[in-house]
Amino acid sequence: MAGSADFDLYRPSEEHDMLRDAIRSLAEAKIAPHAAAVDEEARFPQEALDALVANDLHAVHVPESYGGAGADALATVLVIEEVARVCASSSLIPAVNKLGSLPVILSGSEELKKKYLGPLAKGDAMFSYCLSEPDAGSDAAGMKTKAVRDGDFWVLNGVKRWITNAGVSEYYTVMAVTDPTKRSKGISAFVVEKSDEGVSFGAPEKKLGIKGSPTREVYLDNVRIPADRMIGEEGTGFATAMKTLDHTRITIAAQALGIAQGALDYAKGYVKERKQFGKPIADFQGIQFMLADMAMKIEAARQLTYAAAAKSERGDSDLTFQGAAAKCFASDVAMEVTTDAVQLLGGYGYTRDYPVERMMRDAKITQIYEGTNQVQRIVMARNLP
């Protein structure tokens, strides 16, 4: 019946709405003021990390049994979305903490969970995820990093590339070949610590966007780790990696969604103030049509992303398709919306005095990492509902 206030199918819960309000207030007060400097100086957003840790928002996905908030997948999406709305680099703190630690949550032993999830939940450590290599990007199963058993230890050698927050994170989930004759079924997952002998990092990449989040190579030179740091059974690492991405592609959708919303919000305010021909440019129909299209695309991306988050939380059988769809669609929307935001500001939008050019640069990576959007379409085609 029309008018029923209890029909919640397409509405987040009151608790989720309250969480969004709290994160937005925090992000605007503690993170937004530093976003331009973080980008300009290409420095890690320490202020954001401090604020997120102080409010237990840096890794809300960690289960309560390991000291975390035990937040659901939609709550994690809201945290990332609202932080990305003001600073995309900062949103990679909660996003990559989930990406790096989810293999442990999904497949790790109880001992591994207790050892590594507790410090993450407390804010004493961050997690990164090491899958890609110089010659193994979209073809991740073609990796060359090797792990060789030596008694009660594994010895790792290889190079991982494009590792987000490398050098800042204390813990790294590393995929390595343990049986080269089995291709993807010969890959295993391990937890490597920054302090392990033989671990080192390359120089930060000089990137178009997300400049505050360091992206580096991780070098593994005879890194000797205890055998109990293997995540799951030998040979299951690639399966764990792919299962992880089913869930975490949604966090990239959330990041893209936040970037797009931030760009729309800024452009909307600008066109109401900017006057030409004696009136605000918001009064011109051409401008209104652009804003309408931007808002429409964002809302469609939001519904797809939130629905995918719900499927992640439930573990629905079509999660692989829905996660890829959310990431692909939301990131394309982010690129379109931020480009339009720059256009709405005209020459001002093209300068660093205004945030929309940064948002446009930040948006581009969401179409690339955790699988390019071309790969997402392959994933979707192979998993059509």
What are these regions (language model features)?
Residues 71-72, 139-141, 165-170, 183-186, ...:
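Short glycine/proline-enriched turns and hinge-like loops at secondary-structure junctions
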Residues 144-146:
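Short, surface-exposed charged micro-motifs
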Residues 153, 157-201:
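A short core secondary-structure module
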Residues 123-131, 175:
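A short, Trp-centered hydrophobic/proline-enriched beta-strand micro-motif
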Residues 98-107:
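Helix-loop "lid/cap" segments that line or gate small-molecule binding pockets
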Residues 142, 195-226:
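Flexible, small-/acidic-enriched active-site or ligand-binding loops
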Residues 1-90, 107-112, 119, 123, ...:
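Alpha-helical interface subdomain recognition
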Residues 95, 135-138, 162-165, 179-181, ...:
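Short Gly/Pro-enriched turn/cap motifs at secondary-structure boundaries
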